[in-house]
Amino acid sequence: MNKMLHNLTLHTLGACALMIAAGSASAAEKMTLGVSIPTATHSFTAGIVWWANKAKEDLEKAHPDLKVIVKTAANAPEQANQLQDLLTVNKMDTLVIFPFESASLTKPVAQVKQKGVYVTVVDRGLTDTSAQDAYVAGDNTAFGKLPAEFIAKTLNGKGDIVALRGIPTTLDNERFEAFTGVMKQHGGIKILDAKYGNWNRDDAFKVMQDFLTRFKHIDAVWAADDDMAVGVLKAIDQAKRSDIKLVFGGAGAKGAIKTLMDGSDPRIQANVSYSPKFMYDAIMLTAEARLKGERLPANTIIPSVLITPQTAKEFYFPDSPF
């Protein structure tokens, strides 16, 4: 597999989308593009669904011979079944998939690829990369590294912290490994525990309740997701704990960015970008390449950056579901 990372700025991605909208490529024959994504169970996946349907709208308007079918799944088995429907019923020749889970979707995606379908995997990578043609994602290493650096600096290299993880996926592993890699450089910081919160505010609330019961002093929390940060803050407030000075979420949800902008919660001091718009970008880039009879680079990584109160306005999109 080509290991070279093809870094694209959002500006470049936007330009690609405009080229599609302008009808820069024409299909020689009818093409069916299947899009498989999780259901909107929280604000980030709501953004994924919204951007996927936006891509469908833009592409079908620009290309009458292109059919885009968007399917959402509530769990991994349902998503695997939908892949078979897209293949046998809808006769797709191209697939863009945001896997519900990495391990359980790898074999179903591989089976689709073996039937000659071009496969672009988005965000949650598969455990076997030979099951895909292309991979488009945010910078998961930076997503873990930047918060770790910020927390370490804020704590002056000393303190007790807890961490939340998402769902067992390759991207969660990348984020956590990057986070702990930075923390290993700061011997004065102790990670008391890390547990999965499933990128869900209710699950994160329960995880944080457990942390608060077991640990009588916590300096900071890496919530690793803005939805999970909501659950974390709720648990802290209910427990009336004043020792926790910093809660770092992630992905740039509009509620979190608004809080960062207006300074209404001193525990929210920074964020890290990871917009669900990359779903739109992945679909548009894949369609553009396939309409031209071309392939995407093996890896397209969209940069993540630290969001501060000074830069928050650039990342605030009030009309977005995320």
Task: Please identify what each model-predicted range represents.
Residues M1-L13:
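Bacterial N-terminal signal peptides that target proteins for export
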Residues K3-H6, A27-F322:
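A residue-level marker of the well-folded mature domains of exported/periplasmic proteins
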Residues A21-S24:
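N-terminal signal peptide c-region/cleavage motif recognized by signal peptidases
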